[in-house]
């Protein structure tokens, strides 16, 4: 008895969650006692333990659900954090590339580096007499930048008539440039580039488009960029003056043509009125007789008379003044002879 009481007090009341899963062992232990009262109490205790176990399972399920939600949220937060980190890394890479390669992102929108008189004196201009086919200013800049700092590039485009003819004959529609001028910030770089590259192939990779083309470079001594702009401005002014002269000439010709057309219309109206008046005055019979007798001669004479009779405007001659030496009448002479 005392052993059973001790076992029931300490073992039944102090069942932990770990012992709840071992129901078979506890049932074997209770069967050893062999008493109904003990079994009833054990069954009650088992019901309470089962309720506790179900409550524990529900709490465990809730904890699992919360734990599942928590990692999902943590995963979202981690992905957002990773994306932010990746964006920061890309920005840092772009900034590093921009710092390593200044001016390579927008090579054609650079500011003018040569402004002061000292910079103008130090600058040098190189003339390229033949631009390789379909080479753009950006490509030319990328090829010449390793040999010195460049400022401005000007390439003369192909003649539009020649371009149209080339495209019509099945050629490429890309832009072509015939010649160009490159401005170096330092004239010594321009001289070295001309000495090194002139009459030599462009080179590069084996499959590059301009690998076998040859450089045609000439350093222009004493030539500055403003001389080029002045030359271009002079050519543009000459072209505009020529165009103005041609336009004035064509306007004069057009005005003269319009004036002649209006005069011809007036003369035709006058001739039509004269013909209508003559037909009314002459009568129909005489006109029929003349037309039946000599129709061809009448037609020729009318055409000739109409053509010959042109309206001419002449000034009326002025009245002549009396001469002093004219002979005076006899009465006047008689009176004058009596007086004098």
UniProtKB/Swiss-Prot annotation:
Name where it's found. Nucleus, Nucleolus
Q: Which branch of life, at top level?
A: Eukaryota
Q: Name one GO biological process term.
A: endonucleolytic cleavage in ITS1 to separate SSU-rRNA from 5.8S rRNA and LSU-rRNA from tricistronic rRNA transcript (SSU-rRNA, 5.8S rRNA, LSU-rRNA)
Citing just one GO molecular function, the answer is:
RNA binding
Q: Which CDD domains match?
A: RRM_ABT1_like
- Record's compositionally biased regions (Acidic residues): 44-64
Q: Where is this region: Disordered?
A: 1-103, 272-329
Entry's SMART domains?
RRM (SM00360)
Gene3D superfamilies found in the cross-reference section: 3.30.70.330
Principal subcellular localization: nucleus
Keyword flag rRNA processing: yes
Classification via SUPFAM superfamilies:
RNA-binding domain, RBD
Start-end of Basic and acidic residues biased regions: 1-12, 19-32, 65-95
Domain RRM stretches: 124-214
One Pfam match, given by its short name, reads RRM_1
Q: Which PROSITE patterns match?
A: RRM
GO CC list = nucleolus
Question: Which UniProt key words apply to this protein?
Answer: Nucleus, Ribosome biogenesis, RNA-binding, rRNA processing
What family does this belong to?
Belongs to the ESF2/ABP1 family.
Function, please? Involved in the small subunit (SSU) processome assembly and function, and in the 18S rRNA synthesis. Required for the early cleavages at sites A0, A1 and A2.
What is the official name of this protein in its record? Pre-rRNA-processing protein esf-2
- Taxonomic source organism: Neurospora crassa (strain ATCC 24698 / 74-OR23-1A / CBS 708.71 / DSM 1257 / FGSC 987)
Give the organism's phylogenetic lineage: Eukaryota, Fungi, Dikarya, Ascomycota, Pezizomycotina
